[in-house]
Each structure stands twice: as C-alpha cells, then as structure tokens.
C-alpha cells in the first residue's frame, strides 16, 4: 500500500467529487468489475481510495496507486 500525501488526497477529492461518474480502467481484485464498467463516486477515503457505487451493484473502491479509473462526466 502506498502512502498518500495530504496534497495528493486533496487533489483526488477535488477531481473525484461525490456524484461524479467514472469508468473502470484497471482493478486487481478477484471480484473486480469488468473493465469499462461505469459508476458514481460516493467519496474518497483517508487513504485515497475512490469509493464507487458501480452500475452493476458492486461497491468496490478504486485503490490509490493500484487500480485505475477515469472521470467520464467531462466527456459530455
């Protein structure tokens, strides 16, 4: 697990505010959603994990420094 700086955590919380939409690009978890799955951010925790309510019903977080997602509501 990587340690996140206060500055980086602040940046993540600004980039991924509650309610924004994201798309999963990479997740290293046996129960991971399919790459390309979309979801809604429900928060960013104190270790930098982006908490997501996936459209599939899953709620696995995107782990800082391990997994990857991108914000998609900017695509509109």
Task: Name each model feature, range by range.
Residues 2-76:
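Basic/aromatic-rich interaction segments and small domains that mediate binding to polyanionic partners
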